[in-house]
């Protein structure tokens, strides 16, 4: 079968933050002369390097990376934008005969590329006003508590600060009587534009938490606080969505005098652990993922090699 007819083959490396996805993807890419597509909702932003744990300049020189540093923090970007750009890159790499490795921890972005986005029912303005009223009256915690009581599966993968997704999940549940998570899972099987091998990385909770601790301390040593200060000086204000992201929100809190540094760091570590738990919940619902310990490089290479050879 010719390359122009055969569906592109994608190796997708996924898992929680700090587990070692970047190193694994680079090892795979170097083994077969492949290129990497970053599926990370924060690494798309310029000037946000340390807090997003972007591959280093040296790593990006060793293996070509795509969809890193493509928009400014004050530009709108979402899963639909990512899907469009990623699919264009995949088409180009496939045309050039390159092996394609997708790596990241943003489950929604990965799902969008592999199977498209679930549109769901049209927005209901009356319902949205209802939930915005609840948000104004009871705050994010009240809205999240309502979601958790009505749709625990959605609450397990939606961040308690992500009011947009919380309201959409409640709206879909009201309109259809079915969890948005269940509908998304059904939708992902409808589109199969690629042949995909899903590799998941995970380790014990204690080891992962140690990695998160070390990653946080390393970020601070690399100048994370200065990075956030520079972003504010450049005019990227704290209300921007990327500036509300994990890590940046805590550092802004310190710079504004709302938190002392120890409080900010402790909060960052705690929230990162919670984020990792949500990532594992999201990926754990996908039966197509084969899981490996991060250190099992040779086993991962053999598994990926069989896929690339069509075995």
Swiss-Prot record:
Cofactor(s) required, per the database record: Mg(2+)
Interaction with substrate tRNA: annotated span: 40-43
EC number: 2.5.1.75
BP terms from Gene Ontology: tRNA modification
Binding site for ATP: 15-22
Key words, A-Z: ATP-binding, Magnesium, Nucleotide-binding, Transferase, tRNA processing
Positions that bind substrate: 17-22
Annotated GO MF terms: ATP binding; tRNA dimethylallyltransferase activity
Domain of life (superkingdom): Bacteria
Swiss-Prot/TrEMBL site (Interaction with substrate tRNA) positions: 106, 128
Cross-referenced NCBIfam families: miaA (TIGR00174)
Job of this protein: Catalyzes the transfer of a dimethylallyl group onto the adenine at position 37 in tRNAs that read codons beginning with uridine, leading to the formation of N6-(dimethylallyl)adenosine (i(6)A).
Assembly and interaction partners: Monomer.
Family under the similarity heading: Belongs to the IPP transferase family.
Name recorded for this polypeptide: tRNA dimethylallyltransferase 2
Gene it is expressed from: miaA2
